Structure formats: structure tokens, C-alpha cells
């Protein structure tokens, strides 16, 4: 092993909120974190808006956060890229969209637009859907159908009605489109191989099977009566004259307007894989012209990608690998992609000297039922790795403050913070025993605001709050405030390396 171990611990969803009410972090009994904040140099780091390549005022998220941390520069996110493309007009000339329209003309088939209907900006943005409706209008397409996935996580849990109304107004204004199905993201956007959920979403869109309603608004109202809010709205088929408005059929075109890959993959596979094993498709495989807004998975066949990835050279992981350092990435399932794929700038490749450990997330319906998640198992494993003395750098993510924060259950979020505090109480001393340095930070906020300050209802989304950075084991250094892009240069500074020219972030250690 080289001179010292440098460990970055990302407390996912752990923000700083000056307000005490609804603040699960403030309410939690966390003696270790409190002591670290008292005894070691710390500062605040910005995680939202233009600081991470998002539009002003847009909350950060785990994908964006880890990409910025690993890149050591502000990375302009897909959301910003696509919005800019609509504003500049090149969106309407995209070859992939034009080919989808041409496919509809050639086969006299339908165009289906589906994705998350919200302005949360984490997985999608409704303005991109409006851009596609405008595109369809310009292409003179008549049979255009929208399949709405409701959010309730990155926006308030009961806000679907407003998004539906806005969409219906846009459809009237633009003069094209009709809502064919609605459903919660719980079904259409699973990422944990819970294929029984995905099947219900697929069957609604392909077979016209599921709950029925005469309009999207009626579907929402009926669902709320059953106490099933946006995320959990059961796949519902909109009916007209006794039959579904539209179903997806052979040679139809589909544009999936979600830009974040992780929750878009499963439903995409159901539509595009010839030999699909997730569940039995009653109609089997049939060809469709499928456009992914961004690259969901480079191994996917039978899809085209509208906004192809822009490569990031010399991310932190790649750079220290070239320098001959050994690194470990460790997290539980929910955040494993974030400390690997996203941290490496959207690259699947594992670098030389990079090891990865995945600890399974617990199989529970919602994480408020098990707020500790798999933190203890992650901790046991990372302690084992620290004690082996094989690594120069360890990147660890604790998922709890974010995943439990998303449930909106205050007591559970508090318990989640207490669980990770207990874990930090073991991990930090283990690193210090080896004269190592620990950086504790977060990728964005969540658990520090569990209530909506305007309505008093539960708040399940991320926040725009800054996050802490605590530097332990480096003596009494002076730190300045910064943004997530400054973390990789800070770690390189501690490791004694010049940062590569591609990294525009700056070390937060004041010399």
C-alpha cells in the first residue's frame, strides 16, 4: 500500500437545513457525526443547480452528484442538454426522432411517447414531452399517444392531477396527442428486477389490460380514493367508446423521454428484447421502432439513442488507476451504480486496480420498514477491506438518508441516520488507525427536510440544500466552501498528485 489510505464516505441524501422542523438529521441521536463536526475541519458543499450542471434552482440527485464528484468538474446533465436542444431548435431535426416519424408513415402506425410526467428533473422533464408533441405536430403525425408514468417522489406525492391538467392543456394547444395509459413509477420504472410490477405496466400499454378509466383525471381521482398516490397508481387504461384509446402494436414507434437510465432499462427490455426472460409476453416479441432519449445501456439491441453520451476523460477513478493506485468502490444495490458507473463518468469499464463490492439491499416493499437497510453489512465488509491494507482509496456510499427519506416517514428517516452514525463510529477509527484520511460528505440533501413547509404534508423529494464536508485525519487544515466538482481535486491534493487538466474543480484545502 502507498503512503496513506484516503476514504470518501458519501452519506446519500444528507443535507444541511437550518430549520429544525421536519429535519430528521437534526432530530436523530448521532453522537459520532456530531463529534466529527465539533472536532474536525468542515465546510459546506453545493449540490444543486448550475453548481452541478443543472438548471438554476434544480435540486441535485444521486446520479448527477456522483458524476460531478468523480469527474472533478461540472458536468452538464442530460436535462440541461435536452432543454437547450429544444431551445436551440436542433431537437426537432434529430435523426432518431425523424426516423421514428418516418417509421409511422411507412407502416401507417402509431407514435407512443412515454416517460415520467413531472418537472422533478431527476428522470425526465415534462417540457421534453411537450417538445416531442411539438415535433409530432411539425411532422404532421395524427396517431400520437402519451403513456404517463406518475412521479410522487421527486415531486409531491399527490401532484399528478396538476401535471395531467397541464399536459391536457398542452395537447389542446399544440393540437396533437391523446393520453392512452397512466400508472405509477413503482410499476413502470422498477430497477430491482421486480418483473411482476413491470408486467402490469407492459400489459396496460400493449394489451390494454388493467384498471380502466374514461380519462386520465378520473384515473387519478379513483386511485386517490383507494389511497394509492402518484408513485403507486395501478396501471390504468384510458377507454374511449368501450375500448382502449390506444395500445402499442407491431411497427409502432416509441419515444421514451426519460433521460436517466437506471429506472428506464427494465421496461425498455420488455419492449425490445427478442429473447426476454423477465416475464411471459402474451404477444411474444414484435418489432417496434424504439427511441431511448439517452443511452440506457450500451448492450441494448433494437433501440436507437437520441442524445448519445459525451465522454469524460480523466475522471478520478481513471486518473488514480493510471497512477498505479488500488481503489475500492462499495455500496448496497440501491447506490451501487452510483459509486461505480456514475462515479466513473458513465463508463461501465472497471479500471485496473479497481475493485467493486455490491451488498444486496433488503427486499422490502418500502425502506421505512427497514431503515437500517444493509448499512451494517456494508460496514462489516468495508472494515474487513480496510484491515487488509490493500487499498489506497475507498469510495463508500451509505444509501439510508436518501432511500428512507424518499418514503416521507420521519421516524424511519431518523432511525436511518442513527444507523449510519453507528456505522461511522466503527469505520472512521479503523481508517485513522492506519494514519488514513476520511472525507465525509453527501451527494445531495433529502432527510433534513421531511415535511413540505408550505403544505405541512410529507416531503419525499431531494432538496437544494448544501451538504457537509468533514475532513478527518489531516490535522487542523483550513477548508473553503465549494461544490461537488471540488471533491476529486481535494482527494488528489491529499494523495499528493497534481490534478489532470480536464478537472476544473479546485481543492477545498486552503494552502
Curated annotation (Swiss-Prot):
Mn(2+) 2 binds at residues 12, 62, 443-444. One of its GO terms (biological process) is glucose catabolic process. It catalyses: (2R)-2-phosphoglycerate = (2R)-3-phosphoglycerate. Keywords: Glycolysis, Isomerase, Manganese, Metal-binding. GO terms for cellular component: cytosol. Its cofactor is Mn(2+). Pathway: Carbohydrate degradation; glycolysis; pyruvate from D-glyceraldehyde 3-phosphate: step 3/5. InterPro entries: Alkaline_phosphatase_core_sf (IPR017850), BPG-indep_PGM_N (IPR011258), Metalloenzyme (IPR006124), PGAM_B_sf (IPR036646), Pgm_bpd_ind (IPR005995). The keyword Metal-binding applies. Binds 2 manganese ions per subunit. Substrate binds at residues 123, 153-154, 185, 191, 260-263, 335. The keyword Iron-sulfur does not apply. SUPFAM superfamilies: 2,3-Bisphosphoglycerate-independent phosphoglycerate mutase, substrate-binding domain, Alkaline phosphatase-like. GO terms for molecular function: manganese ion binding; phosphoglycerate mutase activity. It is an enzyme of class 5 (isomerase). Mn(2+) 1 binds at residues 402, 406, 462. The active site is at 62 (phosphoserine intermediate). Its EC number is 5.4.2.12. Catalyzes the interconversion of 2-phosphoglycerate and 3-phosphoglycerate. Monomer. Belongs to the BPG-independent phosphoglycerate mutase family. This is 2,3-bisphosphoglycerate-independent phosphoglycerate mutase. It comes from Acetivibrio thermocellus (strain ATCC 27405 / DSM 1237 / JCM 9322 / NBRC 103400 / NCIMB 10682 / NRRL B-4536 / VPI 7372) (Clostridium thermocellum).
Amino acid at each position: 500500500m502507498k503512503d496513506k489510505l484516503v476514504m470518501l464516505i458519501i452519506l446519500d441524501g444528507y443535507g444541511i437545513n437550518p430549520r429544525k422542523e421536519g429535519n430528521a438529521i437534526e432530530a436523530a441521536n448521532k453522537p459520532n457525526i456530531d463529534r466529527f463536526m465539533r472536532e474536525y475541519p468542515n465546510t459546506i458543499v453545493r449540490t444543486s443547480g448550475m453548481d452541478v450542471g443543472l438548471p438554476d434552482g434544480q435540486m441535485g440527485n444521486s446520479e448527477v452528484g456522483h458524476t460531478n464528484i468523480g469527474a472533478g468538474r461540472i458536468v452538464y446533465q442530460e436535462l440541461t442538454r435536452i432543454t437547450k436542444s429544444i431551445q436551440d431548435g436542433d431537437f426537432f431535426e434529430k435523426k432518431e426522432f425523424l426516423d421514428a416519424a418516418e417509421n409511422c408513415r411507412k407502416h401507417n402506425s402509431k407514435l407512443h411517447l412515454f416517460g415520467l410526467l413531472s418537472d422533478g428533473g431527476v428522470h425526465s422533464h415534462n417540457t421534453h414531452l411537450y417538445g416531442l408533441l411539438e415535433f409530432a405536430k411539425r411532422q404532421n403525425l395524427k396517431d400520437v399517444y402519451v403513456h404517463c408514468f406518475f412521479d410522487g417522489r421527486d415531486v409531491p406525492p399527490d401532484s399528478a392531477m396538476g401535471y395531467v391538467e397541464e399536459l391536457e392543456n398542452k395537447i389542446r394547444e399544440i393540437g396533437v396527442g391523446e393520453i392512452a395509459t397512466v400508472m405509477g413509477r413503482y410499476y413502470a420504472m422498477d430497477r430491482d428486477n421486480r418483473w411482476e410490477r413491470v408486467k402490469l405496466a407492459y400489459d396496460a400499454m400493449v394489451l390494454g389490460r388493467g384498471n380502466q378509466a374514461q380519462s386520465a383525471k378520473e384515473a387519478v381521482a379513483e386511485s386517490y380514493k383507494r389511497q394509492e398516490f402518484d408513485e403507486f397508481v395501478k396501471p390504468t387504461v384510458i377507454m374511449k367508446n368501450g375500448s382502449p384509446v390506444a395500445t402499442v402494436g407491431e411497427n409502432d414507434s416509441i419515444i421514451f423521454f426519460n433521460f436517466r437510465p437506471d429506472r428506464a432499462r427494465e421496461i425498455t427490455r420488455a419492449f425490445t428484447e427478442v429473447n426476454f426472460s423477465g416475464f411471459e409476453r402474451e404477444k411474444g416479441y414484435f418489432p417496434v421502432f424504439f427511441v431511448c432519449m439517452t443511452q440506457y445501456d450500451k448492450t441494448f439491441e433494437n433501440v436507437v439513442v437520441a442524445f448519445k453520451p459525451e465522454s469524460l476523460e480523466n475522471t478520478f477513478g481513471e486518473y488514480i488507476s493510471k497512477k498505479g493506485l488500488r481503489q475500492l468502490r462499495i455500496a448496497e444495490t440501491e447506490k451501487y451504480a452510483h459509486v461505480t458507473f456514475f462515479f466513473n463518468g458513465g463508463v461501465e469499464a472497471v479500471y485496473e486496480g479497481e475493485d467493486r463490492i455490491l451488498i444486496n439491499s433488503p427486499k422490502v416493499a418500502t425502506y421505512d420498514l427497514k431503515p437500517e437497510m444493509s448499512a451494517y453489512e456494508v460496514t462489516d465488509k468495508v472494515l474487513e477491506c480496510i484491515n487488509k491494507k490493500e487499498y489506497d482509496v475507498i469510495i463508500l456510499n451509505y444509501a439510508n438518508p436518501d432511500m428512507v427519506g424518499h418514503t416521507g416517514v420521519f421516524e424511519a428517516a431518523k432511525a436511518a441516520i442513527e444507523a449510519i452514525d453507528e456505522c461511522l463510529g466503527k469505520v472512521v477509527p479503523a481508517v485513522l488507525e492506519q494514519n488514513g484520511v476520511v472525507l465525509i460528505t453527501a451527494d445531495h440533501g433529502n432527510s433534513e427536510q421531511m415535511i413540505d413547509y408550505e403544505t405541512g404534508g410529507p416531503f419525499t423529494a431531494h432538496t437544494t440544500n448544501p451538504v457537509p464536508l468533514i475532513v478527518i485525519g489531516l490535522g487542523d487544515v483550513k477548508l473553503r466552501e465549494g461544490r461537488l466538482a471540488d471533491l476529486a481535486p481535494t482527494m488528489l491534493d491529499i494523495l499528493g498528485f497534481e490534478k489532470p487538466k480536464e478537472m476544473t474543480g479546485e481543492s477545498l484545502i486552503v494552502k
